[in-house]
Curated annotation (Swiss-Prot):
It comes from Aeropyrum pernix (strain ATCC 700893 / DSM 11879 / JCM 9820 / NBRC 100138 / K1). The keyword Cell cycle does not apply. It is found in: Cytoplasm. Residues 271-346 form the B5 domain. GO terms for molecular function: ATP binding; magnesium ion binding; phenylalanine-tRNA ligase activity; RNA binding. Mg(2+) binds at residues 324, 330, 333-334. This is Phenylalanine--tRNA ligase beta subunit. Its EC number is 6.1.1.20. Its main location: cytoplasm.
Amino acid sequence: MPVIRVRRERLESLTGLSIGELEELLFRLKCEVEEPEEGVLEVEVNPDRPDMYIGEGIARAVKGIAGVEEGWDPPELADTPLSLRVERVPQRPYIAAAVVYGVNVDELFLEELIQFQEKLHDSLGRRRAKIAIGFHDLAKLPSASVEYRLMTLDTRMKPLGYGGSEMSFREFLLADEKGSLYGGLATKDNSHPFLLSGGEVIAAPPVINSEITRVEPGTRDLFIDVTGTSAELVAKTLDIIVASLAEREGARVGRVRLEGPGAVWASTPLLSEAAAKLDPGTVSKALGVDLTPEEAALHLRRMRHNASPAGGLVNVRVPPFRVDILGEVDLVEDIAISIGYEALGPRWPGKFHGGSLRWETHVYRAVKDLLVGLGFTEVLQLVLTSPRLVEAAGFSSMAVEVLNPVQQEYSVLRPTLLITLLQTLRENQHRRKPVKVFEAGNAVYLEDGEPRDEEKLALGVLDEEAGFEDVQAPLYAVLRIMGVDFEVEEASHPMFMEGRTAAVKVGGERLGYIGEVKPEVLEAFGLEYPVAAAEISLEVLARWTSRT
């Protein structure tokens, strides 16, 4: 959870509320507040609210839920002389920029601004891999024309924090910790993205800014750039930053014109609101409270949406900084937060239905317990297996193949558990004899051209002289204990020897097969000892097992 450090006095000044009121309201907004040192608050913010990673964003949310302000007034976008030419930068193709006038940076706000930048880098930016942010002193820009393009690693710049010393970007990557952390994110074939103004490098995103445009106490206006690998995320991040800085008293937002072959937008920031509709009936079903469209709209406005009733529904315009709003359910959650979960109160449901196990599950568990009691060990294998083994088992015509397998050895769904059972016996054939194992799981096979998923049970015995009776006896014991009347008849099976194979039937329905594995199958699976095995359908068994 992101923890935001902010001066208590500053937050009280921004909201007009006492620390006690702030703690209560922030708790409703899913935040926790601590004061580890006098005058400094640590606010643990929910990670889906990056708009609250700075004092202005926290204040905006708190004033809304407190009823001090409602909705959100988008700032007017003023034209500026700034233009940004975007060349093609394959490894980091997207860039957006904006100007915010009247920010008036002081020592305390500079600390928060840097913190805001790094929290966004770590969360939305995935440690700068997705997006990176640059803050620049607008007055220090060498030119109103800015350019974003690839240049070689030998390009010289004045990295931030080096007192104006000039070095090549290659030298910086080797000398600075940020070079080792972020240098590989956009470096490719001896080239890297650079941001230039008046022919001078003002940034090498996502690694470092230049000393030329350093932001410091006394900076009045900011030029902001956001670069990244996702156009949507770049635009949203810039909107979050601009909307937060626009909350500062006297601040104004200016647009930057974008041009060139790599430009995605004509100008930025976008600051566009998303349109949505909410049915108060949905709120009632989810929260158990009946709200009129007017009441629902009021609660949404307190959560800083622009909302109004319309024909029994609520028209909602979601502000661009609320990137956590993905659908109707998120708006319902906002209403719950506005009302207060403590005000909703618990209520017993009109009907109560207790969960219980399926009858089939009871049968499956009983069978497994019986086999363990008969000296068998349960194993678990993957449903995916090798097409070579499926062919060796004689089940190729029934196999369901994976269209895009990661490995060829795991490209077919097992049509019978006997395949993976023999694999297990192969891996354990040099252990103390007899080796007795079973598996209950899913087999997937083609039936009338369509894939069918069936729960089955397979058991096998590997021994120096393993025979039909070694599996017949435990299987018969299980069926009799389960109260199943069954009959056995001679049959054929692709994996079992002729004359040593039997089909088990229950009520005329085939339950499964018992048999001794063919020598050629043993050889294909790498088995050096005889194996007797059986496979039955647990689904059929459950249908014919008495419920008494």
